[in-house]
UniProtKB/Swiss-Prot annotation:
Homodimer. InterPro entries: UPF0210. Signal peptide: none annotated. Belongs to the UPF0210 family. This is UPF0210 protein SSU05_0296. It holds the Pfam family DUF711. Gene3D superfamilies: 3.20.70.20. The lineage of its organism: Bacteria, Bacillati, Bacillota, Bacilli, Lactobacillales. SUPFAM superfamilies: PFL-like glycyl radical enzymes (SSF51998). It comes from the Bacteria.
Length: 445
């Protein structure tokens, strides 16, 4: 590495808010299954604190050694619905408490995997877990939850969609922060390092390390140098910048897996914003020539950004995965917040952008009076985009306050303006239940 590259890396960290967003250790809990829920909870706690006891120390050590901030150290586990199903318990709160206790013990930021995979129907554990979510998130501080309700191969479980509309409402009523730690997916991935949607897939190794990077500020600074140039130049600039960002992610992942003695999984090629000025995906899109995010051209700008990030990132590491794209959470991105406040960005435009971006309707506050069926219909729309386009989509909606209020979450979760929601009813549509069949192009065999 020559002196120019060293200087570039220092600038990325000091001036452009570059960091490693997360080192996430995925841990399989399949060997913790027990017919007694208290015994299962004890096994879960023991395995997590044994496998991840050095995660925080190693993360801090690497950060100090390289001079690169590693913002979060996290753990993801096997979907708890699979562990709980072996018991006769009527709720899975003991397992949620075991996860939270383990997370506090090892000093991590979040633990994901209070999850269910219900894309084609409910097994016993799925329904129990889903109904446990509101209290599980209210009674814990570090546990994150997710439910997969659809996939391109199976279609959309509309019964689960209906139930999740209700659960999101109940979760927001049980605790202010609960709904911010709950994601509803279509086409959920098994190696996602980002919260709140991370869980450790059943096809994964026993323990793996996955890395998520963050660098919208770096991309924006690079684009400032090519103002007025053609889109060919813009795409190439983003690609080269994404390569540099991801290369550092690969290095950190290799070092962490080596020192922890576990397998290295993937680098997630996502641009993840924070509420800090200079760390915004929205401002990257505006740098391409948009007056404000939400105006016409926004979806095209996002498409270019997403694709170029992937092309550059793939060259930089041997295993990529997770969600891999650009995140567009409202509360976690100061540019998105500004666009909502000035009226240029609404829910309908956000939905269009989710056909392109890394996930979906993310960290969006809506009025607390919004009916559960309307929330379920938002989930159904997002799931349809994901299922038809063979991509991951998700909903992390927070029904709090009234339209125009500002909801303060703090930290990386930021601040969310409460957005206007269409008032027309979707009740009869949602109450049908059943399964929307898989699309015709899903039959590949």
């Amino acid at each position: 590495m020559d002196i120019r590259q060293v200087r570039e890396t220092i600038e990325m960290i000091e001036e452009q808010n570059f960091d490693i967003r997360t080192i996430t250790m995925g841990i399989s809990l399949l060997d913790c299954i027990d017919s007694d829920i208290d015994k299962a909870a004890e096994k879960v706690y023991t395995k997590i604190v044994t496998k991840a006891k050095n995660l925080v120390a190693v993360g801090d050590e690497i950060a100090a050694e390289l001079g690169i901030p590693i913002v979060n150290k996290r753990v993801s586990v096997t979907p708890i619905a699979l562990i709980g199903a072996a018991t006769d318990a009527t709720d899975y709160l003991p397992l949620a408490h075991a996860l939270d206790k383990a997370a506090h013990e090892i000093g991590i930021d979040f633990i994901g995997g209070f999850s269910a995979l219900a894309q084609k129907g409910y097994q016993k554990g799925d329904e129990i877990l889903i109904n446990s979510i509101p209290q599980a998130l209210a009674q814990t501080s570090k546990v994150c939850s997710s439910v997969n309700i659809g996939s391109t191969k199976t279609g959309i479980n509309m019964t689960a969609v209906r139930d999740m509309g209700r659960i999101i409402k109940e979760t927001a009523e049980a605790s202010d922060m609960g709904a911010a730690k709950l994601v509803v997916f279509a086409n959920a991935v098994e190696d996602n390092p980002f919260m709140a949607g991370a869980f450790h897939g059943v096809g994964e190794a026993d323990v793996v390390i996955n890395v998520g990077v963050s660098g919208p500020g770096v991309v924006k600074r690079a684009l400032e140098k090519v103002r007025g140039e053609s889109f060919d130049v813009v795409a190439e600039t983003v690609k080269k910048t994404a390569f540099k960002i991801t290369r550092i992610g690969q290095l950190v992942g290799n070092m962490a897996s080596e020192r922890l003695g576990v397998k290295f999984g993937i680098v997630d090629l996502s641009l993840a914003p924070t509420p800090a000025v200079g760390d915004s995906v929205a401002r990257v899109l505006e740098e391409m020539g948009l007056e404000t995010v939400g105006t016409h051209g926004t979806t095209a700008a996002l498409a270019l950004l997403n694709d170029a990030v992937k092309k550059g990132g793939v060259m930089a590491c041997n295993q990529v995965g997770g969600l891999s794209g650009a995140f567009i959470p409202v509360s976690e991105d100061e540019g998105m917040i500004a666009a909502v406040q000035n009226g240029s960005l609404n829910l309908e435009k956000l939905e269009a952008m989710t056909a392109i971006c890394s996930v979906g309707l993310d960290m969006i506050a809506i009025p607390e009076t919004t009916p559960a069926e309307t929330i379920a219909a938002m989930i159904a729309d997002e799931a349809a985009i994901g299922v038809i386009n063979q991509k991951t989509t998700a909903v992390r909606i927070i029904p709090l306050g009234k339209e125009g209020d500002m909801i303060e979450f703090g930290g990386l979760l930021g601040t969310a303006p409460v957005m206007k929601v269409n008032q027309a009813s979707s009740v009869d549509f949602i109450n049908r239940g059943g399964q929307i069949p898989a699309p015709i192009h899903s039959f590949k065999n």
